[in-house]
């Protein structure tokens, strides 16, 4: 009888200890999940939208933190190629994403078109431009565009000027910015008379107005691709974030900031 009691007590003690170990393991697992960080490299034009997207994604994945790195798509591409930590890349141009694809840096099947945009000419208060030909007149001294080699918006702007036979006439007035946000700031601050930016950048900007929207046939299609990086240490969570951005909820948020749903 005493032996039976001892065996029962030992069994209870062992069971309790196993329960404690299981709870500890579960707690450690939860803590690890809480510390999951996704590094997102995104085009500068997504700055405002990313704030709301991050908040909404937090409701879906409360244990995931987003570390967002904003900049010119070309600069972000170079950082990724040089080994900078990145789980998800969102580019404002296909050229940069295709370069990473060709180097085998993207997770297979994740390179998708996230959204589209429009290119507009913005002007400072007091400037009146009805058509692009006005850029050649004496009262327009500085035209801001992104650096065409590294800033997709700058590439599109140069295409517009080339295809309307204006580039040679206005190239002496061009001032090149490191990204599209700097173009917008220069016009807002009066450091440039006009500038080419995305519709999403001008959408709620103060101190400027949209002079005109460029014709789609004067520049390449403005598509924003998204992809998960092959070297991501959190591929499942990265794919979950990509899926969220492509979902109806993610697309609705992006549309609120002037972006358009990809066809």
Roles of regions detected by a PLM:
Residues 55-67:
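Signal peptide-proximal N-terminal region
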């Amino acid at each position: 009888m005493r032996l039976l009691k001892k065996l029962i007590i030992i069994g209870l003690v062992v069971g309790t200890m196993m329960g404690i170990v299981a709870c500890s393991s579960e707690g450690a697992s939860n803590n690890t999940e809480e510390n999951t960080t996704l590094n997102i490299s995104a085009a500068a034009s997504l700055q405002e939208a990313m704030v709301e997207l991050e908040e909404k994604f937090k409701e879906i994945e409360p244990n995931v933190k987003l570390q967002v790195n904003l900049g010119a798509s070309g600069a972000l591409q170079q950082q990724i190629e040089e080994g900078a930590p990145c789980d998800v890349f969102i580019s404002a141009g296909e050229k940069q994403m295709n370069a990473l694809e060709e180097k085998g840096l993207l997770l297979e099947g994740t390179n998708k078109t996230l959204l589209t945009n429009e290119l507009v000419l913005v002007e400072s208060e007091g400037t009146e431009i009805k058509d692009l030909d006005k850029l050649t007149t004496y009262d327009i001294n500085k035209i801001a565009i992104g650096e065409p080699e590294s800033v997709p918006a700058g590439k599109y702007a140069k295409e517009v000027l080339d295809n309307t036979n204006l580039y040679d006439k206005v190239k002496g007035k061009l001032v090149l910015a490191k990204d599209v946000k700097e173009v917008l700031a220069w016009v807002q601050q009066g450091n440039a008379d006009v500038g080419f930016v995305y519709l999403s950048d001008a959408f709620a900007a103060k101190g400027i107005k949209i002079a005109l929207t460029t014709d789609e046939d004067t520049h390449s299609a403005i598509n924003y691709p998204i992809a998960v990086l092959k070297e991501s240490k959190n591929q499942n969570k990265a794919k979950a974030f990509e899926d969220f951005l492509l979902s109806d909820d993610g697309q609705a948020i992006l549309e609120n900031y002037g972006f358009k749903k990809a066809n």
